[in-house]
Every structure is written in C-alpha cells, then in structure tokens.
Amino acid sequence: MSITIYTRNNCVQCHATKRAMESRGFEFEMVNVDLVPDAADTLRAQGFRQLPVVMAGDLSWSGFRPDMINRLHPTPHAANA
C-alpha cells in the first residue's frame, strides 16, 4: 500500500504523524505543501482544511490521528520489533 503524508514546515501534528508512522515501521512519501503549492490547492479542492493529510490506499484523513494509523497494517519488520 502506498502512503503519502502531506505536511508543511513547523507543523506539530505533521511531526507527530511522521513519528507515529515511523515507529510502526511504515514506509511513506512526504510532500511538503510549502514547497509544492499545487498539492495544497488539490487538497483544498478535496475538502481538506488541516494538515497533515494522510492518504493510505483507500483511507485518507487529516490531522494527527493515532486511531487511523492503528487501522493500517504495519510492515513485517515492525510487527517483529
């Protein structure tokens, strides 16, 4: 499953989401909307109003959401850690 986290500079919830995903062994791509303004426009058009926005397969959400992160399946090396 492909996971993308849309972030911005100095975003506390973005950093918390990144740390939570890393601690569970997920691989993901990060897109900084401060550097990619078109990404911010696309997210707004999709109804997102807060960062981070996480897109993981058919799931997507905004904000730091440990409950949603826990719904994802970790990679095998994290499950054995």
Curated annotation (Swiss-Prot):
Domain Glutaredoxin per the UniProt entry, residue ranges: 1-81
Cystine pairings recorded for this chain: C11-C14
InterPro entries (UniProt xref): GlrX_NrdH, Glutaredoxin, Grx-like_ET, Thioredoxin-like_sf
Pfam families: Glutaredoxin
UniProt keyword Transport present: yes
GO molecular function: electron transfer activity
Keywords attached to this entry: Disulfide bond, Electron transport, Redox-active center, Transport
GO biological process: cell redox homeostasis
PANTHER family listed in its UniProt record: GLUTAREDOXIN, GLUTAREDOXIN-LIKE PROTEIN NRDH
Family assignment from sequence similarity: Belongs to the glutaredoxin family.
Role, per record: Electron transport system for the ribonucleotide reductase system NrdEF.
Name this protein carries in UniProt: Glutaredoxin-like protein NrdH
Organism: Salmonella typhimurium (strain LT2 / SGSC1412 / ATCC 700720)
Gene: nrdH
